[in-house]
Amino acid sequence: MSAPIGVLALQGDFREHRQTLSAIGVESIEVRTLADLTKSAGLIIPGGESTVMQKLAVAYDLFEPLHDAIKAGLPTFGTCAGLIMLADEIIDGIPGQRGFGGLDVSVRRNAFGNQLDSFEVDLKFKGVSGDLVHAAFIRAPIVERVGDEIEVLSTLDDGRIVGVRQGNLMGISFHPEVTGETRIHELFVSMVDA
């Protein structure tokens, strides 16, 4: 890969994503400007607070460029709030809340409750070899509806969807970057390289 992977660095746990990419030998840059975005071979939208992320993207004049780049085919991976930002529909968003879109899914924010209801679990993840993926759910969203073009990558034991892919877009409800899990980032890098 000649160009680095950009990590949206307006808010959230972007540093942890950069550390994970570094651990697998992939160069990354923090995306805060349009110039940063244009240097990126792919984009990671980290966990954080989706409403704040939207406001900051607008304030930094990045909202429309991000929306347009994703729509034009920039490989993009969203975790937790990043999944919310990639969803075409946010079921319980605050008035005026919208994401960049791209994934034909409907998501519900904070579907598992508040910070105190956070949990970790091991789960299967399509496209990842080896053992189960160790996943941390922190005020996580859930995918409640998937469109015809959506590939479900992961579910909880009760069937709730926590990982999806549509073409070169991937979104997950959980945080692999905080558990030391690198295989999902490796999968995303393979999507960027494809």
Task: List PLM regions with ranges.
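Redox-cofactor binding/interface segments in oxidoreductases and associated redox assembly factors
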Residues: I45, G78, I172
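Cysteine-nucleophile active-site neighborhood
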Residues: S50-K124
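Short, well-ordered secondary-structure micro-motifs
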Residues: R18, A87-E89, G147-D148
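Cofactor-binding loop segments of dinucleotide-utilizing enzymes, especially the Rossmann-like FAD-
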Residues: L10, A81, F174
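Hydrophobic anchor at the start of a short beta-strand
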Residues: S28-I29, T76, L169
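General beta-strand structural signal in soluble alpha/beta enzymes
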Residues: E30, G78-T79, V164
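Amide-donor transfer/coupling interface in amidating biosynthetic enzymes
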Residues: R109-A194
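N-terminal beta1-alpha1 cap of cysteine-dependent amidohydrolase-like domains
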Residues: M1-A59, F63-K71, T182-A194
